[in-house]
Amino acid sequence: MAKATVKTDKQEEKQRQRELQRRADLIRQRTASRRRRFRLGGGAAAVLLLVGAVAVAVRGYGSTTPTSAVAASLGAPTGATPPTPTGQFHKVGSVLRQGGKAEFVFFGALYCPHCAAERWAIVKSLSQFGRFAHMSSTTNGQGVPTFDLTHATYQSKYLSFVARDMEDQNGNALQALSADQRLLFSQYDPSGGIPLVAVGGYAMSGSPILPDEISGRPFNAVQSALKHNAGDTFVQDINAEANELTALICHADGMQPQAACGRPVIRHLVASVR
């Protein structure tokens, strides 16, 4: 009886892996198609300051499950680090600033699986510098649980946050970019890939967090795993990316606050940022 159970478990695992691979193939095809929509051309003009205030108030596609305590429930920061000091980020220019504060930019779309995965790290990192409100949890069209920031606000003494989801779950136009934002997008990411994350003079197109790692899991399960620093690969990946984002923010804002920027892992990462 035990042997039969083992065999069944193996069969189920193989079936699960095949399904994940099928989803990954579909995601790659859909993302490749979507990216063509965001090719906005090159641009050599100087980067202009983005429109926005201390809080980013965005509106758009409705989502589910109001989660006012979500940001504070992703667990304490850990010592996880990316494979390289600056992760997948590359130097793009001077530090973006808004109202005298370092500016953090996220351009994505609600259908985008890598955007969904990256939001976990963004929320965990930025919660160390300020406070989110009016967030929701939702599930991406490919089954990836994530945060919906389209109604969110963010307040911080140290950081300005700009988040724009350009299309909804069905690929319909959602949040249009301003002229300055389109210029920044074309300069930092000429290929038009999403998500685009920019902070501290560095930018990244894509995400090192594999969406398949959390696809099909309930939002609360991912949240709980992060809160308890479980041994799952996605927990390590999200925590490492959160630390990378934190280091870039600390580099840009003069290493404040000490609670976020004074940790040894962050000081080590900041030392590698030019």
Model-based region annotation:
Residues I122-L126:
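An acidic-aromatic
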Residues A109-W120:
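Conserved redox-active cysteine motifs that mediate thiol-disulfide chemistry
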Residues M1-E103, A117, S127, R131-R274:
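Non-globular targeting/processing and membrane-anchoring segments
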Residues E103-A109:
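Short glycine-rich or small-residue beta-strand-to-loop segments that form or flank ligand, phosphate
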